Amino acid sequence: MREAKIAPLSNYGLQWCFEQLGKEEFQTFKALLKEHASESAACSFPLVQVDRADAESLASLLHEHCRASLAWKTSTDIFEKMSLSALSEMARDEMKKYLLAEISEDSAPTKTDQGPSMKEVPGPREDPQDSRDYRIHVMTTFSTRLDTPQRFEEFASECPDAHALSGAFNPDPSGGFRPLTVVLHGPPGVGKSSLARRLLLFWAQGDLYKGLFSYVFLLRARDLQGSRETSFAELISKEWPDAPVPVEKVLSQPERLLIVVDGLEELELTFRDQDSSLLADWAERQPAPVLAHSLLKKVLLPECALLLTVQDAGLQRLQALLRSPRYLWVGGLSVENRMQLLLGGGKHCRRKTCAWHAGADHQEVLDKCQVPVVCALVREALELQGEPGKGLPVPGHTLTGLYATFVFQRLAPKDAGWRALSGEERGALKGLCRLAADGVWNAKFVFDGDDLGVHGLQGPELSALQQASILLPDGHCGRGHAFSHLSLQEFFAALFYVLRGVEGDGEGYPLFPQSTKSLTELRHIDLNVQLVQMKRFLFGLVSKEVMRALETLLGCPVRPVAKQQLLHWICLVGQHPAAAASPDLLEAFYCLFEAQDDEFVRLALNGFQEVWLQLNRPMDLTVSSFCLRRCQHLRKVRLDVRGTPKDEFAEAWSGAPQGLKIKTLDEHWEDLCSVLSTHPNLRQLDLSGSVLSKEAMKTLCVKLRQPACKIQNLIFKGARVTPGLRHLWMTLIINRNITRLDLTGCRLREEDVQTACEALRHPQCALESLRLDRCGLTPASCREISQVLATSGSLKSLSLTGNKVADQGVKSLCDALKVTPCTLQKLILGSCGLTAATCQDLASALIENQGLTHLSLSGDELGSKGMSLLCRAVKLSSCGLQKLALNACSLDVAGCGFLAFALMGNRHLTHLSLSMNPLEDPGMNLLCEVMMEPSCPLRDLDLVNCRLTASCCKSLSNVITRSPRLRSLDLAANALGDEGIAALCEGLKQKNTLTRLGLEACGLTSEGCKALSAALTCSRHLASLNLMRNDLGPRGMTTLCSAFMHPTSNLQTIGLWKEQYPARVRRLLEQVQRLKPHVVISDAWYTEEEEDGPCWRI
């Protein structure tokens, strides 16, 4: 058992989120953050530091003054206020991860008035005779059911979890606080319940909590369900039915009492937060759930100690009920003990070694061997697989194959010779599988006589299953029966679906409802954590090897009915490329890895072209390698490789029998790199946000140099790869297929820049696009880069956004642009600290270099003076600029005048972005006069947040009507109102070329929807419309939906947040999409871009 550690990458992850914000967005974030800090006492910090902070220092500031989870929650709330849905979704996922980590690490909670201080801790005292009688009762109950060493010290030496458990109720040395609630949490089947029961036995033996507790009682959460009324005294009495003393005496000293509640994931914890419904009297009769919640919330017997067991999946719901708990994570057997139990000596050691060596990779098997019973199962399966040819074919070497080996051998008739199951025996097997499936779906793991009888498991059938060590009497007072381990129940539940392929067996729980058409619907089904492992077993069972063994056991063919449903699930997972790393995709890969069926896996992954995976464990690398190799049409891969833990299995493998070998973490990574570098169709590899060591980067780069590597685009945005970058530069020289490289957010030292530029100047380097945004570059770095521009025959695009290179650095770049061999076409210098003085050098470069077609200066304080200088070049008919981005450049009316004058002479400028400049209506009118000229070349114009009003809309309407080329106009965040929109609509009704119109947050209401609706039915070309953040209301939306559905409407992309409208309106929008399936209605309008997307505006 170990206490979880807060992930050290929280600060860096938050910094990465901030770096995704534009300059204006970042300032808005900081303003909202200061508002939040002034209202919240939980996260306060010096507000004056916020204004000066960049992304890195702001992330550090938040973590310095707030817990990691609170820093993420604060940021998530602000991202949602800013309508940044993608960032808020990612931040919410990160918040949950760090919240769970804090809970796990919090083994010493803050002192409250719940428990006594160190001075108040009850000291050792002699137990009375009645307590000793109870200890005898506990030892009689549990010692015959637990295979436990005689003394606690012996057990603790084999089970590391026991060490932390022995001191779970000790006071905190730093603050003196003694917890009265301890939570044991971990994955299912790891041995939490067994550990809790052993605790009772060791206490009874006097080895544990000596003198601290007079009584320790074990309650099962499933016994606290239902509406039946009882009292806490009655519950205790049932645990000691022949008590020689009244229960009142037992409960009279609650500070000497420990209550163990096992399996809290089975208890319904969505309890209304009304303390008035709870009770403090242990003699009062109430429904059992009320008693449970009263106990957990310390209303009932507040002085008693609680030890709770819960699966990780149920931990988040539980924490709201508890008062200052201590959380301890149960990890099961140590790796060394697992190895000893699995591969220890004995007469069959050679068989196990042979069977293990035949397997492809057994890390997942080792990971599941967390308790002795599973180790024994796997060990027996390895021995059986070591002597093939005895009746049943070997069902493979995966976890499913090993379980199938064990189960099929135990179920096979023990008659002389070998035969298949008889009809009666097949019926008993089906009944057992139905019982298991019923339990998995209903979270039921102990079955009474009625449950067994319903499924025909009585008498000889039940006796046979007990003899086979499959279904055993429950270890707690012998009530009911349970599978020998939870994983065995999950295996039989999966087998239930496979046996549907046997004629006449089609009833039971549907694996996936037939109406399921989306992954979102499926996620609601997969809430039960047991379904995850059941699903993996099911994929393993439909593999050819296991099916062959099963058909031999049954003596009849099994139709592959489950296979089609599994394919349907995989197809849903791959339906749409995710906006973030989806756990569903990685889980699908684990399932397919379990199948180990090449034909089936290739068919399942046939439609996958883009994947995004978060890889945290060595096994994640293995399953990803296996599946990515079989994604035949894969073109884009994003991998988040973060915090991969130390490979404990590989380290412990030195004690394995000679001749066996397990792959190290480095070897797993090398395999994955080999798959990526040799995939025939993969063109883009994105490792954004990953943390790669120098050795990991070296391995990757060596593989990327292979002749078979077809990757063209490498992305390391926000990745921690700087120590290994020197290996990347040589790769750029050797692999001429790599033409695009993005190192945004990677801190580059001067020596890194020098080495990179040497490679870029090499004649063999074919790099065409290089992004070095926010890399900490200096003017000296620009001098190195300028030499590349002057000599490279391939580099066409360079982005240096967010580097404070200043005027001096840009001067070096401009000098290089004037050199004849320079091939650069796209230059992005956003937020580089440029001033008006720089514009003279830029203008000079534009005059001499007609090959530069894209220029972005967004976020630089150019002002009117800078525009005056820049436009001297832009106005020339020889100027080759086609796309110019000047967002947030402090342009006003005067700047518009210079720009309008330049547009009169320029014949090539087709894209112009002026967002976040205070142009106001007079400046807009100046531009409109030029844009109405037939010779004006502008096609795309962005005017987001330019302080425009309805006064300029008449001019804009005339532009829409008269401009022969204008196709895109974005007016978001301008206060146009219904009047202004109505004026624009007059232009839309006329013959025009506009295909894209942005009206987000323009003050449109339901009153203006009638005019817009009429325009939509007339416009022949308008295909994309953004209406986000407008108060349209149900009435306005009803009017617009009529226009959306109109046959003459050509709309294909509509920006709307459907969830903000009532059900009636959402049904209308669904009707639109049913009538016109090609129409996309989404709040991600800016991602639904044409051609080269919004990148030119950066």
UniProtKB/Swiss-Prot annotation:
GO biological process: actin filament organization; cortical granule exocytosis; establishment of organelle localization; establishment of spindle localization; exocytosis; positive regulation of embryonic development; protein storage; regulation of cell division
Gene Ontology terms: cellular component: cell cortex; cortical granule; cytoplasm; cytoplasmic lattice; cytosol; germinal vesicle; Golgi apparatus; mitochondrion
PROSITE patterns on file: DAPIN, NACHT
Domain Pyrin: 1-97
SMART domains assigned: LRR_RI, PYRIN
Domain of life per record: Eukaryota
Biased composition regions of type Basic and acidic residues, renumbered to the chain: 122-131
Segments of this protein annotated with the region Disordered: 104-131
SUPFAM superfamilies the record matches: DEATH domain, P-loop containing nucleoside triphosphate hydrolases, RNI-like
InterPro entries named in the record: DAPIN, DEATH-like_dom_sf, Leu-rich_rpt, LRR_dom_sf, NACHT_NTPase, NLRP_HD2, NLRP_innate_immun_reg, NOD1/2_WH
Keyword vocabulary terms for this entry: ATP-binding, Cytoplasm, Cytoplasmic vesicle, Golgi apparatus, Leucine-rich repeat, Mitochondrion, Nucleotide-binding, Nucleus, Repeat
UniProt note on tissues of expression: Oocyte-specific.
UniProt key word Nucleotide-binding: yes
LRR repeats by residue range: 851-871, 880-900, 908-928, 937-958, 965-985, 993-1013, 1021-1041
Post-translation changes: Phosphorylated by PRKCE.
Entries under Gene3D superfamilies matching the protein: Death Domain, Fas, P-loop containing nucleotide triphosphate hydrolases, Ribonuclease Inhibitor
Family: Belongs to the NLRP family.
PANTHER family: NACHT, LRR AND PYD DOMAINS-CONTAINING PROTEIN 12, NACHT, LRR AND PYD DOMAINS-CONTAINING PROTEIN 5
Quaternary structure and partners: Component of the subcortical maternal complex (SCMC), at least composed of NLRP5, KHDC3, OOEP, and TLE6. Within the complex, interacts with OOEP, KHDC3 and TLE6. The SCMC may facilitate translocation of its components between the nuclear and cytoplasmic compartments. As part of the SCMC interacts with the SCMC-associated protein ZBED3. As part of the SCMC interacts with the SCMC-associated protein CFL1/Cofilin-1. Interacts with PRKCE. Interacts with TUBB3 at cytoskeleton microtubules.
Protein name in UniProt: NACHT, LRR and PYD domains-containing protein 5
Organism, scientific name: Bos taurus (Bovine)
Protein encoded by which gene: NLRP5
